[in-house]
Structure formats: C-alpha cells, structure tokens
C-alpha cells in the first residue's frame, strides 16, 4: 500500500509578492485596454512604503504607472502612504522585431507545462484547490471583519493511499490581524468563518491537525513585514507543486510571452484530455525558440492513467490543438485586459478564463 502526504500553499492578495503581481497585471490591463497589441514586461518590487516599478514596454497606451500602483494597493486594503519610483524603458527593438513579423512569434525561448487531474470538479489537484479556497475565504472574511488585515497564507496537506485521496491531514492558516485581538479570538474566527465553510467535512477526521497563526502574533504584515516582488509565487500560481512548471512567471507579461500564453494553452489541452476521460491525470509540455511561431517540441505524460498509450494521446493532441503562437492568442482571446483577475488565487481552475474551457476531442 502506497501512502503519502502531499502539501500545497496559497497566499492572500495582501501578501507582498501578490501585491506586486496585482500591480504588474493591473498595468498590463491598462495597456491592453488602450492598445491590444501592447508588448509589456513591467514588474514591481515593494518594501515598506517604497514601490519600484520597472521593466520594458512597447505600447501606444498612456499609462500612469504610479496611479495604478497606488490604486491597486488601496483596493487590496492597505491604507499607508506609499512612494512610487518608475523606471520603464522602451522594449528592445531586436525583441520587438523578432516577435512582430507578420504572425505573432514567441517572445522568448522556454519550456511550459500544463496539468490537470480528476481530483476536483475544476480538474485541479486537491491540495492547491483547498489552499486557494481557504485563501479566498480568508480575504472575504477579512473584508468584513476589521480584526483581520490583508496579509495571509494558507496550506493544506492531503493524505493519499495508492494515489487516491484518503483525508486531509493538516490545515495551516496564518493571518495578519489588528493589535488588540487575542490569538484565541483569531483561532475562533478562522475555524468557524474560514475553515468550516470551505472544507468538505468528509475529508476531516479526529486526527486532522490545525495550525492557526502558529507563530503567534502577526500584526506587522504586507510590505512592512517582508519585501515583495513580481513572479515569486509561481508554484501558488500553477498547481501547488503537483504538476511541473517551466520556471517563468506569468504576471506582468503580455500574451506574446509564451511563458504565459503557452502555459495557459497547455492547461487547456491537459484539462480537455482529462475531461474527455482520456486520462485521470495529464501533463503537457511544450517548448519554443524566440522569434519562431511553431513549437520546437511537445510531449504528454498521463502517469499510467491513460485510456490509451501516451503516444496515441499525443497524436490526438496533434489532431485537435494548434500550438502556433498566433493561434494561441486568437483561440484563447488573450489580447483582452483580463490579467488582473488572474493575479491572485491561481491562474488555473477558474471557469471565467478561456483556457479553462473544455474542448470536445475527436479521436
């Protein structure tokens, strides 16, 4: 009998790294709203009350970078006064010319992965599914309870037996809070208002462990407790470590950057494989060279759960999907200002996004 525990974590929108992701994607949306053909790679770093916005852009849009950053921080729930410094240059003409020659070509080389499984109705692994769900619920509760503050993290450990979900072993929730709130009250709020409404009670038992603010007091948070930078939560953004990732972050990048668009397409392919019951688990990898519109390789792994051999499933993928970069942008409609919505609680598993649709496969 093969028994093991797998753990994934998520963070709230007030986590400093996620603050930076949201600022970067809010800037991207502002550019795409005015100029859908914007090429953007504008990132953010934050520490204390200092915000640095930096990167490259090629756009006809008129963007007030500082105003977007300050509005994003305020919307998250931080009320301190912040100072913004902007260092944004024109995108290299060599890169711009390589990407924009007729049909859109890959904006960089790299490898991308997509993953799906049948552990949840969203075709996401259960540990990250519940970690995100807890983080979203924590934010919802916080917005209606002044005792809680924006920064927070969640973590869920799931026990598997022969690769089947058995139970939830451990739940960890850490939340920033007001100074005059006791840890006993925090634990009561989190257990009753965050954990119980989120978690299927059939997965919990008398041995499930709960760690709520295990370090104790958590008054100082956000950028005053830790620095933040765009692109530092790529495991939270994807599959919680359950599926592999290519290493490139998503936030800040326009869809010509295949780090983002091709990873979305790989998820679309993997999810369609599982939803069409060709496999219980599927992982798709693709690679590109800068300035080329077609991938240089792609493969699939169904981890022994496939209805057919992986070679046959790869053939089905080739007959049903087109990994041409220009096609990816068109098929998934990626030139729209949709990216701020992706920047918290994972880029995958939310049915509002085009890459979460399911394609009926012909085979």
Regions found by a protein language model. Give the residues of each.
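N-terminal, positively charged regions that mediate nucleic acid binding
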Residues: 1-41, 46-47, 141
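Internal helix-turn-beta structural module
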Residues: 47, 279-281, 285-363
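Glycine-rich, mobile lid/loop segments that gate access to catalytic sites or pores
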Residues: 7-11, 50, 67, 74, ...
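Alpha-helical support elements that line or immediately flank enzyme active sites
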Residues: 13-32, 120-136, 254-277
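Short, charge-patterned binding micro-sites
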Residues: 42-59, 290-294
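A short glycine-rich, hydrophobically flanked beta-strand micro-motif that places a catalytic Asp/Glu
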Residues: 38-42, 148-158, 208-212, 278-289
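Short connector loops/turns at beta-strand edges and beta->alpha or beta->beta junctions
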Residues: 2, 47, 118, 239-245
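Glycine-rich anion/phosphate-binding loop at the beta-strand->alpha-helix junction
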Residues: 181-273
